Amino acid sequence: MSRILLGVNIDHIATLRQARGTSYPDPVHAAAVAEHAGADGITIHLREDRRHIIDRDVYLLAKTLKTRMNFECAVTEEMLNIACEVKPTYVCLVPEKRQEVTTEGGLDVAGQLDKITAAVSRLAANGIQVSLFIDADKTQIDAAVASGAPLIEIHTGCYADAKTADEEAKELERIREMAKYAHGKGLIVNAGHGLHYHNVKPIAAIPELYELNIGHAIVARAAIDGLATAVKDMKTLMLEGRRGE
């Protein structure tokens, strides 16, 4: 049985920081905690609007990570320049719309093959392995192969957002089929988006999947699981302060 890896996305640690414009919680610290807990890699998305991860995070993480950085970005000159300077292990090219809350779908590789191929070639020339975030679709998988990218990440959002058991089963089967198809084409196949503690097992059971990238669910679970300790620690400090300790 092949091992499956976990890439922990720490974007929403940064979201919490940016909500108040503070210096904490620090995603760099969060990455170290995640690595210590068993994360096989750290995923970050530097968006053009810098809504959560900021440039400072990227450069510090490049120096401090003990595992691997998976750097998600749009296919823009600015982002490609940053990627080529930082040289993460992986760059995952994703679609990006300013008004979206989170990435809403896969990259249309087939519709912009020349642009994607040029980006893949440029990143590869800098020693970076390129992944393309795409829907579970044969046309997009074939285009990914044509672009020269060695990896894809299958968008699992439709599976995660399924409203009925039948819809979920249909999406799961589609992901299974496309993971097998892509693997047969020689691609390394990852998956992610919307995965959480109640839907991850069927995805993790797909033998062709190499790594799952999961973030929001882990950060949300951490906020609840760590809340009791955080409240107790704050109450202790307040009581010590009142006693003059």
Curated annotation (Swiss-Prot):
Organism for this UniProt entry: Shewanella oneidensis (strain ATCC 700550 / JCM 31522 / CIP 106686 / LMG 19005 / NCIMB 14063 / MR-1)
Name of protein: Pyridoxine 5'-phosphate synthase
SUPFAM superfamilies: Pyridoxine 5'-phosphate synthase
InterPro entries: Aldolase_TIM (IPR013785), PyrdxlP_synth_PdxJ (IPR004569), Pyridoxine-5'_phos_synth (IPR036130)
Keyword Transcription: no
A molecular function GO annotation: pyridoxine 5'-phosphate synthase activity
Pfam families in UniProt: PdxJ
Subcellular location as annotated: Cytoplasm
Main location: cytoplasm
Subunit structure as annotated in this protein's UniProt entry: Homooctamer; tetramer of dimers.
Gene3D superfamilies in the cross-refs: Aldolase class I
